[in-house]
Regions:
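Immunoglobulin-like IPT/TIG beta-sandwich domains and homologous Ig-like subdomains
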Residues: 519, 526, 530-534, 906-978
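Beta-propeller and closely related beta-sheet repeat lectin domains
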Residues: 191, 310, 423, 502-507, ...
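Beta-propeller blade signature
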Residues: 529-538, 582-594, 640-652, 690-692, ...
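Peripheral, non-catalytic regulatory segments
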Residues: 15-483
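Asp-box/WD-like beta-propeller blade repeats and closely related beta-sheet repeat scaffolds
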Residues: 582-672
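Beta-propeller domains
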Residues: 371, 483-494, 509-551, 575-594, 665-802
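Conserved blade-ending motifs and adjacent loop-strand segments that build the rim/top face
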Residues: 711, 770-782, 822-846, 939-943
Length: 1008
């Protein structure tokens, strides 16, 4: 099967990143101003379009500095004194005293583009205008001037940019009014005069040409630029006047000046005249318009030079356009066609109606042909579909939008969508690239229209078309882009037992019981101790299944691992606030299934503590047997703690090392991912970055490429609070293959749209790159569990939000299975679903019998009346993976020696019930603790070498502490796909002699 190629792609707009933590999220969104300079206030979001402006008086554009304030200033100062100001498309400003008839108000959410000069303000959108009002009543409604001297109104007539009703454009000194235009036509000796598009004395003539006919007066709805109480035509419509007096001259002079116009042959900066060109035959041949009643060749060239353009064009006496090439198949016209005098210098030619006087600083002028849809030579398996109409203004068929103002191309858009696993792509408004699924088009009632309606060139490729306003050039992937399997055997969820605690940390001990820690003392129950142990063998007897334990300080958002000492102690570090952030807590599992233990958590902050207070730290067992603790903050929503430290702390020494990259990326790097690599170096993943560290100095050895995020937001993150989950993919004897790391889920800043992809990397490859695989659904706060057969279950989490209280919604009830033995793009199977929402503070843990324990959910999301949207979840479930759902009897084995040295050989005696020794496998899964989606062993699984004679098999332990850091492992035997119950083995001993630490009388040390 053909699979998508993963490419490096253009970056998209940066998005304001909110600072968010477990209990708060401060959203920093752009603002719709409710109050503005002086008495101006917001008047709402209004529909606008290029054919009939809602505000049709003065206007200007600023591609880099537009703000609400600057637009209001423009509309209320100098010769402008308007009661309405409007900002549109991030960079355009419009003024007027009237809202055009038929203009309609829409939801403020549709005005969603930020201003080019202030990203904290909204400046409308495509065909959407943020309107502001100064509080004063507008002047009287404009009128159609019935007569001006001997000129009499004939009404509103249709016109066209290609077939003019009147043949001769006319230059007018100053801003256009009915009186100034009729005077100019009379002075030039013409019978008819027409005013159009507010500021154009566009036509004078002796006859009415090209079949121009009367139209309704409402079509001439634009007020004159020089007098807002008069109407001066509209788009492609003119107010026509007839001279009833006696003409003293016969009309024949296009400029009306009576003098020959000069072509400026030499300008500063190497600018030269390039000729007269036809405009609007197929569309505007230049963009970046500037209008000025005092326009000159020199001022237009200066404007274009300041904006780094190489071509300047002047039209209609007062219009200046800039660009670097002429587009839409521009063709030359006779120089005599450019016969209108400049508004600011009557001796210079400034084009004419649909004629541009063109100047260039490069000598040559590049002509870009009329753009067409790109239908051949497409990347991958993309196929052009046609022009798709959006369902309604402001809504979109495809969900993910990129805005590439200057560099949108069909190829870039298709590659971006394919790289993130989306088989439908659409290009719109020249600069927008949308990605999604073909089903999105169907579900949103997408309708194909004529290809001719998608007529806007791509911002980065003017030769090809990229849709139009509310129209997209659509492309589909021809083939299967994401092969998500739907097997018949999908396993199932089962209710296990009601809980006494809403856990935030779950750990399976070597006594085969599960310890739970909660955010003490914030339990649902006043008498909760914050710590309990569950005996899985007694779940049918609720009163016997739970054992009460105790912690002395608040473990909320701490980190846990299993020590390699003889007792397999569980160590928990960090906490919620104050003294608890320094906490070090130890528990030695005891008892056995069906028999209560007596040990409890041990803690004494006066004797044993971290060197720095930490909330949301990660802990990792190093190859030398010491404990690495990294990151966090100084307390709940406190300043960053961007450092690492080593436990046990040597006498008199401080092991803290500051990490500048954690300082820089706070608060989006909490619970960083830590994994020991086969080289002995350490992988650290935080926010959307990753690097490899030296195991002795902790200096950076390699900065890895940034992690891919969302298709439309490269600022998406993978660690808390934009929380994903990470594991190490399987290692197989003889351990020569490079190791691979898998990270799934996460979220985006701002809107907090969860990610629907997994990414993987071989960090120690010669040229490491991330490979992206799309998941069937979005997921933030997921959990990932390593299974004995080398597959991984992905479950829990939400479709939207980030980690923290009340910050996520729309639970993801479905479970997935990731199988790294399959080809990339074909590794995910869709499993069963639950009815229990598992959001913030949920866990998933492998049990010794091969089932997955699913617990927790502490979202604290409430309705306005205070009732919970999602409950504090006490119910504990198990998931029966497909390998146990077949009904096969699990294999069995016995083992004599469970304390293994690296590279040693150890015997087991196996009993298989389905297969034979030839199909048997053996796996070792490192002991771990689950919290916030972080498996602090990295979910390490090893398939060691073994040989068998009869039913006695000899396993060779992993060769070194880089492949297998010291610690306890669950040993499984697999009969085909079916795992046995596990046995605990310790591999690599206790090289740092943690079993003798800490040496205080109130701590129990199990020995090494």
């Amino acid at each position: 099967m053909n699979l998508p190629i993963f490419l490096a792609l253009p970056l998209v707009y940066a998005i304001i990143v909110p600072k968010n933590h477990a209990s708060t999220l401060v959203h920093r969104h752009p603002l719709h101003h409710r109050s503005s300079p002086s008495s101006w206030t917001s008047y709402g979001c209004w529909i606008d379009n290029t054919g009939a402006r809602t505000l049709s008086a003065a206007s200007y554009a600023n591609t880099t500095g537009m703000t609400v304030e600057s637009c209001i200033s423009f509309c209320s100062s100098g010769s402008n004194s308007y009661v309405y100001a409007g900002v549109e498309y991030a960079q355009e400003c419009y003024c007027g005293n009237f809202l055009a008839s038929g203009a309609s108000n829409v939801s403020m959410s549709e005005c969603d583009m930020t201003c080019t000069g202030n990203a904290s303000e909204f400046c409308g959108a495509g065909d959407r205008l943020n309107v502001y009002w100064n509080g004063t009543q507008p002047p009287s409604s404009p009128i159609i001037v019935r007569s001006a001297g001997n000129w009499t109104s004939l009404g509103c007539y249709n016109d066209s940019t290609t077939t003019r009703a009147l043949a001769n454009g006319m230059g007018v000194t100053g801003e256009v009014t009915v009186e100034s235009c009729t005077t100019a036509c009379q002075d030039a000796g013409y019978q008819y005069a027409g005013v159009e598009y507010a500021d154009e004395c566009s036509d004078c003539g002796m006859t009415l040409d090209n079949g121009s006919e009367p139209t309704p007066a409402s079509s001439c709805d634009m007020t004159c630029a020089g007098n807002s109480s008069e109407y001066c035509g509209g788009p492609d419509h003119l107010n026509l006047y007839n001279y009833t007096g006696t003409l003293t001259t016969t009309g024949n002079a296009g400029s009306g000046t009576g003098t020959e116009l000069l072509l400026t042959a030499s300008l500063s900066g190497g600018w030269t005249y390039g000729g007269c060109y036809v405009d609007n035959a197929n569309g505007r041949v230049l963009g970046d318009e500037l209008d000025s009643d005092n326009m000159t060749v020199e001022s237009c060239v200066a404007h274009c030079t300041a904006d780094n353009f190489t071509i300047a064009g002047l039209e209609y006496s007062t219009q200046c356009f800039c660009g670097n090439e002429l587009i839409d198949g521009a063709v030359k016209a006779p120089d005599s066609d450019c016969d209108m005098a400049c508004g600011g210098n009557a001796t210079e030619a400034c084009g004419a109606g649909n004629r541009l006087s063109v100047y260039t600083s490069m000598g040559n002028i590049t002509i870009i042909p009329v753009p067409t849809p790109l239908t051949s030579g497409l990347p991958g398996q993309w196929v052009y579909q046609g022009c798709l109409a959006e369902p309604a203004p402001g809504s979109h068929l495809l969900p993910y939008e990129n805005d590439w103002t200057n560099n949108n191309t069909v190829e870039a858009c298709l590659n971006q969508c394919a790289a993130f696993g989306y088989p439908a792509a659409g290009l719109e408004y020249g600069e927008q690239c949308f990605c999604g699924d073909i089903s999105d088009v169907v579900d949103n009632n997408g309708t194909f229209v004529s290809d001719s309606e998608c007529n806007m060139p791509c911002s980065g490729d003017p030769v090809h078309l990229c849709g139009a306003n509310n129209l997209m050039s659509a492309y589909y992937w021809n083939g299967t882009m994401n092969a998500w399997h739907t097997p018949k055997n999908i396993g199932r969820y089962e209710f296990l037992i009601g809980g006494v605690v809403v856990p935030l940390i779950a750990t399976v001990g070597i006594n085969n019981k599960v310890t739970f820690l909660e955010k003490y003392p914030t339990s649902e129950f006043a008498n909760s101790t914050g710590a309990y142990e569950l005996d899985i063998s007694l779940v049918d007897n609720y009163l016997l299944a739970w054992r009460e334990m105790h912690v002395k300080s608040d473990v909320f958002c701490s980190g846990s691992i299993i020590l390699p000492d003889k007792g397999a102690r569980q160590i928990n570090v960090g906490g919620w606030s104050l003294e608890s952030t320094y906490g070090i807590r130890l528990y030695t599992p005891d008892g056995q299934p069906g028999v209560n233990g007596t040990n409890d958590w041990e803690e004494n902050a006066n004797e044993l503590s971290l060197q720095r207070g930490r909330w949301y730290p990660t802990a990792m067992m190093m190859p030398n047997g010491s404990i690495l603790v990294v990151g966090g903050e100084t307390g709940s929503n406190g300043p960053p703690q961007p450092s690492l430290e080593i436990l046990p702390k040597p006498p008199g020494g401080d092991t803290v090392i500051t990490l500048d990259y954690l300082q820089r990326t706070d608060p989006n790097n909490l619970y960083p991912f830590l994994i020991v690599l086969p080289s002995g170096r350490f992988f650290i993943g935080y926010y959307n970055e990753a690097r490899i560290l030296d195991p002795v100095t902790f200096d950076t050895v390699t900065v890895l490429p940034n992690m891919p995020g969302a298709v439309n937001n490269f600022l998406a993150g993978r660690t808390y609070p934009m929380e994903g989950t990470a594991v190490l993919l399987p290692q197989h004897a003889p351990y020569t293959d490079p190791i691979e790391i898998l990270i799934c889920g996460g979220s985006t800043p701002g809107a907090a749209i969860a990610l629907d992809n997994c990414i993987s990397i071989i960090p120690e490859a010669s040229n490491p790159t991330w490979t992206l695989e799309r998941m069937p659904s979005k997921r933030v706060m997921p959990c990932m569990v390593t299974l004995p057969d080398g597959t991984y279950m992905i479950l829990n989490g939400a479709h939207q939000g980030v980690a923290g209280f009340g910050l996520a919604s729309d639970p993801n009830f479905s479970a997935l299975l990731y199988d790294p033995s399959q080809p990339v793009g074909q590794r995910i199977s869709i499993l069963n679903s639950t009815i229990v929402a598992r959001l913030y503070h949920s866990e998933a843990t492998l049990l010794p019998d091969g089932r997955v324990l699913v617990s927790g959910s502490d979202p604290e999301t409430n309705y306005p009346n205070g009732t919970a949207v999602y409950p504090e979840e006490f119910r504990i479930e198990v998931y029966i993976p497909p390998y146990l759902n077949q009904g096969f009897r699990q294999p069995e084995f016995t083992i004599a020696k469970t304390d293994w040295t690296l590279g040693g050989q150890y015997d087991i005696v196996v009993t298989l019930y389905q297969g034979t020794i030839s199909t048997m496998r053996v796996s070792l899964i490192a002991a771990s603790s689950s919290t916030h989606g972080n498996v602090m062993s990295g979910g390490r699984i090893i398939f060691p070498e073994f040989t068998c004679s009869g039913n006695t098999c000899t396993i060779t332990a992993p060769p070194n502490a880089f492949v297998c850091p010291p610690g306890w492992h669950q040993l499984f035997v697999l009969d085909g796909p079916t795992p046995s119950h596990s046995a605990w083995v310790r591999i690599g001993g206790d090289p740092a002699q943690l079993g003798n630490w800490p040496d205080y009388p109130d701590f129990t040390t199990p020995g090494i």
